[in-house]
Amino acid sequence: KSLMEYWLFKSEPSTWSWEDQVKKGKEGEGWDGVRNYQANNNMKKMKVGDLGFFYHSVKEKQIVGIVRVIGEHRPDPTDKKGIFGMVVIEAVKEVNKYVNLSDIKSNENLSELALIKQARLSVVPVSKAHWQEICLMAETENKF
């Protein structure tokens, strides 16, 4: 069995918010609408059980929750060309303290984080060390 991987999912709260995700419960929600090849390739690597940070983009720019992958890569029904896919994620818990982008950028332990390095991508990998560091910043125990 491969080790768990960690990810970060960016969403515009006006389009799909943490509250929307939480309302879906155990059924989860397909992470559709991704139209970037690299973000799509990142989703292709995801396995059921992988964890991710849920990040509100645009004005907020902060990590607000933790999600789990419950469905692996499959066709995205919103992509009429059939090029891009999606995974299914469920909300696990809200973080105890929101972690904003400025705090992430000012933490030297996170200088290599893909969120900073590949700022345009909506789905990015997070290393285990970065995951643990952000959990500390979020005052959220890394047990899910």
Regions found by a protein language model. Give the residues of each.
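Short, conserved beta-strand edge motifs with alternating hydrophobic and charged residues
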Residues: L8-K10, F54-Y55, I66
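Short acidic (Asp/Glu) patches
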Residues: G33-Q38, G71-T78, N107-N109
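Short acidic/glycine-rich loop or secondary-structure boundary segments that cap or lie
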Residues: S17-E19, K61-I63, P77
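Loop/turn positions that initiate beta-strands
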Residues: G49-D50
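Contiguous surface segments at macromolecular interaction interfaces
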Residues: L3-W16, D76-F144
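Short beta-strand-centered aromatic/proline hotspots
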Residues: Q62-E72
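Short, charged beta-turn/beta-strand-edge "cap" motif at the junction between a beta-strand
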Residues: Y55-K61
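Compositionally biased, charged N-terminal/linker segments
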Residues: S2-M46, E141-F144
